[in-house]
């Protein structure tokens, strides 16, 4: 995902113009059909020959869709929405779950506006909520929103992490500190190999005692209020993917982490 200071680019605006300038007949054909909107994104090519960047794609995306179908999460959150590809892909699956809601957190207002237009075009705007701002701030807002909206809210069912890599751990510690992770919560993190998220991979594979030491030593850039929860027991599996994407050979992996319980406190 783009860096926090990235205020958008001409490329993303070109893509939005492409969608807005589609013939009315084509717009009518894809409206309300998430799979056709995704196809439009997949097939779009910029003048320089490149495609829309930072999309989860059908291979890794299909793997995560399988997890959604298996777990049937009612509340799913993504960190890093970009132009809405994953929100449409995963939000479409969430729409099949009674009471399901998908929250997409995106720091860049320009990207979020484009994502909203695409989500609306896909007919998922009543399922997908796009929140603009730093993930740490939006997570606090979301927690209060869910507590107010649903008195029975306990924790998030599923979290998809795909934003700025050096914020994977700090923002996960925010989620932990807000008590939004409980046994059964599933964390799915993209780009573990390319471009790489080694600190996150290490963190979710730590024992509770190792995580307690880490949290005591490493200050969270999001603030002292978000030290994290060392007593959460995580079980992590890494799924590797390899193949050719737009004529480039790529290798990547997704970390799938489940909270399976609590460690006993001293």
Curated annotation (Swiss-Prot):
Q: Where in the cell is it found?
A: Cytoplasm; Nucleus
Instruction: Name any one Pfam family assigned in the record.
Output: Methyltransf_3
Q: What Gene Ontology cellular-component terms does the record carry? A: cytosol; nucleus
Q: Where does Mg(2+) bind?
A: 162, 190-191
Entry binding sites for substrate: 165, 191
InterPro entries, sorted: SAM-dependent_MTases_sf, SAM_O-MeTrfase
Q: List residues traversing the bilayer.
A: none
Q: Which GO terms describe its molecular function?
A: carboxyl-O-methyltransferase activity; metal ion binding; O-methyltransferase activity
EC number(s) per entry: 2.1.1.6
The keyword Repeat appears for this protein: no
Amino acids binding S-adenosyl-L-methionine = 56, 78, 86, 106-107, 135, 162
Question: What are the alphabetically sorted keywords of the record?
Answer: Catecholamine metabolism, Cytoplasm, Magnesium, Metal-binding, Methyltransferase, Nucleus, S-adenosyl-L-methionine, Transferase
Return the broad EC class: transferase
Question: Per the entry, which co-factors are needed?
Answer: Mg(2+)
The record's Gene Ontology biological-process terms are: catecholamine metabolic process; cellular detoxification; methylation
Q: What is the UniProt remark on how the cofactor binds and its stoichiometry? A: Binds 1 Mg(2+) ion per subunit.
Q: Which reaction does it catalyse?
A: a catechol + S-adenosyl-L-methionine = a guaiacol + S-adenosyl-L-homocysteine + H(+)
Name the protein family: Belongs to the class I-like SAM-binding methyltransferase superfamily. Cation-dependent O-methyltransferase family.
Q: What is this protein called?
A: Probable catechol O-methyltransferase 1
This chain's source organism reads: Schizosaccharomyces pombe (strain 972 / ATCC 24843)
């Amino acid at each position: 995902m783009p860096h926090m200071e990235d205020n958008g680019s001409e490329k993303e605006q070109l893509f939005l113009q492409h969608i807005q300038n589609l013939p009315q007949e084509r717009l009518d054909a894809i409206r309300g059909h998430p799979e056709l909107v995704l196809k439009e994104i997949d097939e779009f090519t910029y003048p320089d020959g490149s495609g829309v960047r930072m999309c989860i794609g059908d291979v890794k995306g299909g793997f995560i869709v399988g997890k959604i179908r298996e777990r049937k999460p009612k509340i799913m959150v993504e960190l890093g929405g970009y132009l809405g590809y994953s929100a449409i892909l995963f939000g479409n699956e969430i729409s099949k779950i009674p009471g399901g809601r998908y929250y997409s957190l995106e720091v860049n207002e320009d990207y979020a506006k484009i994502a909203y237009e695409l989500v609306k075009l896909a007919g998922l705007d009543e399922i997908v909520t796009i929140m603009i701002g730093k993930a740490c701030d939006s997570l606090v807002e979301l927690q209060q929103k869910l507590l107010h909206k649903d008195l029975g809210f306990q924790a998030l069912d599923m979290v998809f992490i795909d934003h700025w890599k050096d914020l994977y751990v700090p923002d996960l510690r925010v989620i932990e500190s807000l008590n939004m992770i409980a046994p059964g919560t599933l964390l799915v993190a993209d780009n573990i190999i390319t471009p790489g998220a080694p600190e996150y991979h290490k963190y979710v594979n730590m024992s509770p005692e190792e995580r307690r030491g880490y949290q005591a030593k490493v200050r969270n850039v999001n603030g002292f209020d978000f030290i994290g929860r060392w007593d959460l027991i995580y079980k992590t599996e890494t799924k590797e993917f390899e193949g050719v994407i737009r004529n480039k050979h790529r290798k990547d992996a997704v970390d799938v982490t489940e909270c399976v319980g609590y460690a006993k406190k001293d």
